[in-house]
Amino acid sequence: RDSLLRAEAISFDKDSILRALDFVAFNDTTFLIPDYSGDSRFCWVNRQGKFLKKSGVIPSLNEEALKEARPALAQAWRSFIDYNPHNGVLVAATQLGEVLEIYNLQNGFHRVCLGPKGEPEFKLAGGYAIPDGIMGFSDVQVTNEAIYAVFHGHTFKEIMAQHQKEGRATDGGQYIYVFNLQGEPLCKYTLDRYITGFHVDERNKTITATDVNNDQPLSLIHISEP
């Protein structure tokens, strides 16, 4: 069997980085990390883990939470992110609700795409965000031509009901949404399985996906042109 050996470990500045649940490499010297303090949208750090700056804001319409409960709001807005250095497009897809944020770091373009399920919903308890509403996205990839995102769409009530009835709930999303680099919808793929993560190969028109509900978790999915 092949072994995965750690080449390097980077410790982030604990005084500036609240927690790091996802990251992307901006270039050879800089990483972007979602900011879970609620003060901004992203933290920038160097290869040594030193904090450089913050940028962006949480694009929520919940003015009360923005004023009084920003850390909890940031928890609810936890997002999966991806960045393509060739076109400069950075995308954040929310784990709750249905929000896609698009930033072009080369030309300054910024757009917030709000889907029918709306922004993340949560209940405040002891300063923490308790998820409500729906499970949203679980992965996102920015290719040279498009944005792909795995979408779930199940409400937490549906998830709990299935868990009570069957002893477990199906994990993952059955849909892959495809947008152009400006956030305009191109198409939606409905899969015959539920996936959590994926990698898109546009050249060969395939998607390698992970299905955690299956004993054979890796799947190869053939796709058509968006």
Language model features with spans:
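Short beta-strand elements that form the blades of beta-propeller/WD-repeat-like
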Residues: D28-D35, G88-T94, E145-H154, K205-D211
